[in-house]
A protein has these predicted regions:
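Active-site flanking loop/helix segments enriched in acidic
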Residues: 25, 33-59, 106, 147-149, ...
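Alpha-helical phosphate/pyrophosphate-handling elements in metalloenzyme active cores
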Residues: 46-86
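An active-site-proximal "capping" alpha-helix that borders the catalytic cofactor pocket
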Residues: 60-65, 114-127
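His-Asp-centered metal-binding catalytic motifs of divalent-metal-dependent phosphohydrolases/nucleases
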Residues: 61, 83-103, 119, 233
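Alpha-helical scaffolds flanking conserved acidic
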Residues: 78-91, 136, 140-144, 148-149, ...
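Histidine/acidic-rich helix-loop-helix segments that form or flank divalent-metal centers
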Residues: 125-215, 222-225
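A conserved active-site cap/scaffold subdomain adjacent to cofactor or substrate pockets
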Residues: 206-259
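Conserved small/polar residues in nucleotide/adenosyl-binding loops
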Residues: 273-279
Length: 280
């Protein structure tokens, strides 16, 4: 019997997580951590409904990825079950390295290390725990797999990440301009020469998608009030980092202290991946 976990999502309805590798990924503490990370950071000061999390977004992107894989298969694009599982695992973990407050921590108390870099490090850490079961997912995430359209579904101009966050952020903020027709866009996807393409009759839907994304940046992501709050937070963190560098004892959670009292750069971060980092 096919066993699965069913999750009721307010944006897409029921999401099926099959028992096995994908279910183990969803249950992993590093992915569950995203339940405590708001998707839109400080945007809730402007849009009080924007309380949704990176975990919800990851599940939504997984749902869209499953739909996209099924749609591409119906058009004669052969995708092995192992490839489908791997790309679904990759999209589940694509934001696993995200910190709180959206992108505020990048290039502030963490220098030159993007959340994608941290996501990859954490994926490799989980892969070791799972005895290499995520090797193919990591290859797809790093764009090292021959079928490049799989990576483009995870990270590209028309990936499942963007299709979910526009719908989800629109839903929770109430800004209707982001409510794109994701189902229609997915139906228009195809593959040519191992690259993701769109059928000509889907161009209008893509134009709407691009317009919706631009409007969401204007109205939500770059809203002057939330940006001002982010600037104040960045100034506070940089000042705290400066005081920490002088050996001053600061009142902070163990997790924040780790970043304040250690220099985290792209080069140094590799040596920290074996540590059990504080989670509170």
């Amino acid at each position: 019997m096919f066993e699965r976990k069913i999750i009721n999502d307010p944006v897409f309805g029921f999401i099926n997580i099959p028992k096995g590798l994908l279910y183990d990924v969803v249950r992993h503490p590093l992915l569950q951590r995203l339940n405590r990370i708001k998707q839109l950071g400080l945007s809730s000061v402007v849009y009080p409904g924007a309380q949704h999390t990176r975990f919800q977004h990851s599940l939504g992107a997984f749902y869209l990825m499953s739909e996209a894989i099924q749609q591409l298969a119906t058009k004669g694009n052969f995708i092995f079950d192992s490839e489908a599982e791997a790309v679904e695992a990759a999209i589940l973990m694509h934001d696993i390295g995200h910190g709180p407050f959206s992108h505020v921590l990048e290039n502030t108390i963490v220098q030159g290390v993007s959340h994608e870099d941290i996501s990859l490090m954490l994926m490799e850490r989980i892969n070791k725990e799972m005895n290499g079961q995520l090797t193919l997912a990591i290859q797809i995430f790093k764009d090292e797999y021959p079928k490049r359209f799989l990576h483009q579904l995870v990270s590209g101009q028309l990936d499942m990440d963007r299709l979910d966050y526009l719908r989800r952020d629109s839903f929770y903020t109430g800004v209707t301009e982001g409510n794109i027709g994701s189902a229609r866009i997915i139906k228009m996807l195809d593959v040519k020469d191992d690259h993701l393409v769109v059928e000509s009759k889907g161009i209008y839907s893509i134009e709407n998608f691009l317009t919706a994304r631009r409007l969401m940046y204007w109205q939500v992501y770059l809203h002057k009030t939330s940006v001002a709050y982010e600037k104040m937070l960045i100034s506070t963190l940089l000042r705290a980092k400066e005081l920490a560098s002088r050996g001053i004892d600061l009142f902070a959670s163990p997790a924040l202290k780790f970043f304040l009292y250690n220099d985290i750069s792209r080069e140094a971060s590799v040596s920290y991946t074996h540590l059990t980092l504080p989670t509170n």
